[in-house]
Amino acid sequence: NFMIHYLRRFDKHCFTVQLHDKTYTIGEGQPLFNVIINKDIPKKELLASTSLALGEAYMRKDVEIQGDLFTALRCFLSQTGQFSLDKSLFKRILYPSESKSAQKKQVSSHYDLGNDFYAKWLDPSMSYSCAYFKNEDDSLEQAQHNKVHYILEKLYLKEGMTLLDIGCGWGYLLIEAAKKYGVKGYGCTLSKEQWKKGQERIEKLGLQDLVQIDLVDYRDLVAEGRQYDRIVSVGMLEHVGRSNYPLYMETASHLLKDGGMFLLHYISGHDESIGNPWMRKYIFPGGTLPSLREIVSLAYDDEFQVIDVESLRRHYYKTLMCWFNNFQNVRDEVIAARGEEFARMWD
C-alpha cells in the first residue's frame, strides 16, 4: 500500500497505523499514538503536498488520531524535511498577491470570523499573541496582562507621549497604555470585527480623548503626515508578506520621531522558507514567518539601532496550550455553530 510506504519515512518516532483492518507499526519502540485511516489519501495528493493532504484528510475525518493529537503533530512536524511539496501546483497559496486589496481580504478571512468565536477561547482581553508567564501558575489572562505591561515598560512611556500600534487587534494594549501612562494612542487594523470591538471598549471606558482606532492600512499612514514618539506592533508582521518587509520597516522609520522607540513582537521562523501550505490555505492566508536575521538586517537598513532582542519561545508554547485547552472546552459549541470540519480545522 502506497500510504503505508509513504508514512514509513516518518520513522523518527514510533506510531501505529490502522488501514483496511490491518495494523502497521512505524518506527522503533513503544507507539506514541495511532493513526486511523478511514479512507485512502490519493497518491498524487500526498506527493503534491504532505501538509495539505494530511491536514485536509484530518478535517474530513478520513484520518483520525487515537491518542494525543499534539504528540502526533510534534512527531510529523519535527520531520518536515520528509514532506513532499510541488510548489508549481500551489503558486496561488504559496505566492499570493501582497497588494493592499489582497491583504485586506486575507486579514478579513481570519480575523472577521466573528468576535463571538474568538471570545470563546481567548482570554477576556482578547489578546491573540504570545503571552508572558512570569510565574508557573499564571492564568492565561494574567499572562496576557503581563505581556502587554512588559511591552509598555520596554517602551519607556511617559504621560503625553504619542503611541502608534500597527495592527492593534481589539485595542487592549492601547487602552492599557492610556490608563497607566496617560499616552495618546492611535491604532490601525484591517479587521472590521476588531475595529468594532475596539471602538466599543474605548467608549465604555470613556477613553475617546486618549485612544483612537481606525480601519486603515499601515501603508497609508505616512500620507497623514503624523509622527509618533513610540511605535509598537504585536503579531502583525506575519501578515505583511516577504516582499513588503522593506516597505514595512521603512514606513515605521518614517512614522517614528527622531529619538523614538519601535517595539516589534512577532513569530519568527528559523529561515526564510515559504511556509506550510495547509496553514496558508486555511488558517493564515498570505501568512509568512520572517526570520530574525532578515528583520534585524532590514532594521539597520532603515537606520534603526537594535538595542534589545528577546525570544519568548517557551512562553508561546504555554500560550498555545492554553488556547488549545480553552478551545477543547467549547468545541461542542463551535461544532454546533460552524460544523465539525471547521472545528477539526482549528484543532
Task: Name each model-derived stretch.
Residues G259-I267:
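Conserved beta-strand signature within the Rossmann-like core of class I S-adenosyl-L-methionine
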